[in-house]
């Protein structure tokens, strides 16, 4: 019998494992991908907006070479934290069901577990926001961006104007790619990193990167893409489409467990903010998942406290 079963091995899932260990509780972390899978799926050359200190968990120092750490530095930090604290983490194992009996029976793709308590720290990176247009299922369409080399010398359309979309556009352009951006709004977003925003705006102004504002993709074909623009329909020759339009948490999974969701307020789950316990006794939420569709509400720095709240509530129950 496990005291705490944690679903998700992201930074906050790891923080929950550390907090459980500190309180003398037995725990296991189940992760369907690799360690800190969301971070692993970030672009290869990504630099965080946050400083190293804001990515730290459990007051374990994050020493980086620069004030703003890279993806590789973050991966190394969380690997080191997990290994040095001997956390029990099962990777590439997907949770299929959580059922409340006397305790919780958790069925995964590899095994069955019994746990007194379950913590859900699954983040929001699982489900991409789809374009819902014909041709989106073609292999050329991707919702995650990794390495710009893949798009060198190719015609790539990037949908969106977020940090990830802008980074992808600039990196692919500098690897010799032919880049066009399709943006619903009238300009590059104000939340784009301040040191990157002038770069993308200047590349667009000089014509190195094409940009179609107030525009949407209407159809994706094997060799071309149709775009609805203020000037009418345009057809662009195209090899790849990177639809970097954001992601959302797997709320269906939560509702199957019995967790109530407020569909009127960003589909936020109903939980006690003092203990992080949901309406299902013994099931807790931690991290960005707590914000429902409002995925910018919680992040590593301000949701670490969730781990401490959860374990403080579990310990007296025995």
How would you describe each model-predicted region?
Residues 136-150, 247-297:
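FAD-site-proximal beta/loop scaffold in flavoenzymes
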Residues 286-318:
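A conserved FAD-binding loop/helix module that cradles the flavin
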């Amino acid at each position: 019998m496990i005291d705490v079963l944690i679903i998700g091995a992201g930074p906050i899932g790891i923080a929950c494992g550390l907090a459980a260990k500190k309180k003398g509780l037995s725990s296991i972390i189940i992760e369907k991908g690799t360690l800190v899978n969301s971070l692993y799926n970030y672009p290869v050359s990504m630099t965080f907006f946050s400083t190293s200190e804001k990515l730290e968990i459990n007051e374990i120092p994050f020493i980086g070479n620069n004030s703003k750490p890279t993806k590789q530095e973050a991966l190394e930090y969380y690997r080191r934290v997990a290994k040095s604290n001997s956390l029990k983490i099962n990777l590439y194992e997907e949770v299929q069901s959580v059922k409340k009996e006397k305790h919780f029976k958790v069925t995964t793709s590899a095994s069955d577990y019994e746990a007194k308590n379950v913590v859900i720290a699954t983040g929001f990176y699982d489900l991409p926001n789809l374009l819902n247009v014909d041709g989106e299922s073609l292999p050329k369409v991707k919702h995650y961006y990794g390495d710009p080399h893949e798009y060198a010398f190719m015609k790539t359309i990037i949908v969106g104007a977020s940090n990830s979309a802008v980074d992808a556009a600039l990196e692919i352009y500098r690897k010799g790619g032919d880049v066009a951006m399709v943006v619903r709004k009238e300009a590059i977003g104000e939340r784009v990193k301040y040191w990157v925003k002038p770069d993308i705006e200047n590349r667009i102004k000089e014509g190195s990167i094409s940009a179609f504002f107030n525009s949407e993709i209407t159809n994706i074909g094997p060799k071309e893409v149709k775009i609805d623009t203020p000037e009418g329909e345009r057809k662009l020759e195209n090899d790849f489409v990177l639809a970097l339009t954001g992601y959302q948490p797997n709320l269906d999974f939560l509702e199957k467990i019995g967790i109530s969701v407020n569909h009127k307020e960003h589909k936020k789950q109903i939980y006690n903010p003092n203990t992080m316990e949901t309406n299902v006794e013994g099931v807790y939420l931690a991290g960005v998942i707590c914000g429902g569709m409002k995925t910018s509400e919680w992040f590593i720095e301000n949701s670490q406290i969730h781990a401490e709240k959860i374990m403080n509530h579990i310990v007296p129950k025995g």
